Amino acid sequence: MNDLQLSAELALFLTKLPSEPGIYRMLDEEGTVLYVGKAANLKKRVNSYFSKQNTGVKTRALVSQIKSIEISVTRSETEALLLESNLIKALRPKYNVLLRDDKSYPYIHLSNHPDFPRIELYRSKKKPPSGNFFGPYPGVAAVRETIVTIQKIFKIRNCRDSYFKARSRPCLQYQIKRCTAPCVHYISPENYKLSVEDAIRFLQGKCQIILDALAERMKQAVNQLNFEEAAVLRDQIKNLRLIQEQQGVVQLRGDADVIAIEVRPGFACIQCVTIREGQVLNSQSFFPTVPYAVLDEELDANSLWQQTFEAFIGFYYLDTTERIPDLIITNQSITESRSLEYILSQRRGKSCKIQVNPRGVKSRWMDFAVNNLRISVAEYVSKHSTIRSRYQALKQLLALDKNIERMECFDISHTQGEATVASCVVFDTEGPRPSEYRRFNIEGITPGDDYAAMEQAVTRRFKRLIDAQLLPDVLIIDGGKGQVSIVKRVLTSLGVEDITLLGVSKGPSRKAGWEKLILVNENREFVLPEDSKALHLLQHIRDEAHRFAITAHRKKRQKTRVESTLESIEGVGAKRRQALLQRFGGLRELAKAPLEEICKVQGISEQLAKRIHEHFHP
């Protein structure tokens, strides 16, 4: 043991640890979990933290806070790794490498519709629907781009089932040749199924299998003199070959993931390149939060690299065995490579190898991954140095003693008092936190009363924040002195102190750069120069709050107008309105519908159908 003063209880606990696989949780004096780890031998691993040889900065900082340790014995290392991964996701301990919850990364989802499956972007923390999932992808843009590619080549529908059922004629997707209009039976379930199977193979990287199948189907179509179908298949082959050329095919059997990692002070970057059947299928960047900001010792840098790699293995591979490849290639040796190989192979049901710094063809993959890694790191550093400098400028402007860790901004949106919505956006030292944004539907106020709307939104928000103990350091209000004064009164009534309240008023010209800032705590108003970094940060937050508010307002206004339009027709209540919208997909389509189609809607009599039709065609 080192010179750390251990309690008698903890010292005794260390001597009685079992020599079995399992996980351990290190807790501070308040019972907060500081770190979660796994071990093939709990006794050896946990005691190693208190060894004199363990001199790492991060380890010393961690050990100094440990007041108790909890363990869970598992039947195998595989079970330990799974449990460790799940606990890290659930508890998000301070000293673990933290990857963003994989449920917040976007996936491609192919539904399990019996005849005509739908392709869509899926990202939710709710229980996922049944069907096939592909991903995760690094961002929404990558998913949307892939879906568009699949629609262009394989023409898979992307409309909601309710819209699909209600169609009586093809939609715009058919007109622009991204769908085969299965809604009106322009394609048989059998042929659509072939397209879906090809799309799945495409997402799995099996392009050559698709090309061979398409070539055979094109040959059959020509022999049957079905030249129209042959032309469609020819275009699919052409587009697929173009994608293959862009991806750079390498003649090598098997699948591989190439993982390059760089650990820097304050963050790490993981570049994962997916190779399937010799071609680059995907390249993604992940930026986990590292547990310690200062890496001034080689030991800490190496141990964090190892921890980052293991965290990524748990995050990326253990939830779904379909993602585990034949080979994982890395740019640095792995301390527990054999153990990880065994765990992944056991989970997969067949061999998975880990290879370090490969030669030959595989080295080109690593070069590709490392090159992308450098670009990703450079972009991250550039972006976050700008964010940090802006935060520092705002801190100096507001003369704050502590760093700004969290800011929130409120805005109100309505159209002459109609469909009033308040938005709340959240920023931290990483920038915007969209998952924490909130919208508030404002009810029970005089239409157009922005003061009452702001009062209601801030009251509702801060009652929740007080309970969660998650108050911002700076609260920004998009509005003038009157709105800011209302918010100040709300905070005082709730007993909220130590928050810097700042108003951002657009000024008489309402032009960017002429904003007037209202600092309530000091009872002063001022205008910043256009090149002020603090002003740029405030403009960014204010604009994001405005965007979020106006988007919510437009959706609410549209919904309200649809409801009021239909319910103004005698005989149309909530149930019939819903039936009409489900059948036609929207008010615009209903307005275009002929009388015969309206009569087909369940619950709509011929007389009522005439009344509805005459409402839109007086």
UniProtKB/Swiss-Prot annotation:
One of its GO terms (cellular component) is cytoplasm. Disulfide bonds: none annotated. PROSITE patterns: GIY_YIG, UVR, UVRC. Keywords: Cytoplasm, DNA damage, DNA excision, DNA repair, Excision nuclease, SOS response. Residues 19-97 form the GIY-YIG domain. GO terms for molecular function: DNA binding; excinuclease ABC activity. Residues 208-243 form the UVR domain. It is found in: Cytoplasm. One of its GO terms (biological process) is SOS response. Belongs to the UvrC family. Interacts with UvrB in an incision complex. HAMAP family: UvrC. The UvrABC repair system catalyzes the recognition and processing of DNA lesions. UvrC both incises the 5' and 3' sides of the lesion. The N-terminal half is responsible for the 3' incision and the C-terminal half is responsible for the 5' incision. This is UvrABC system protein C.
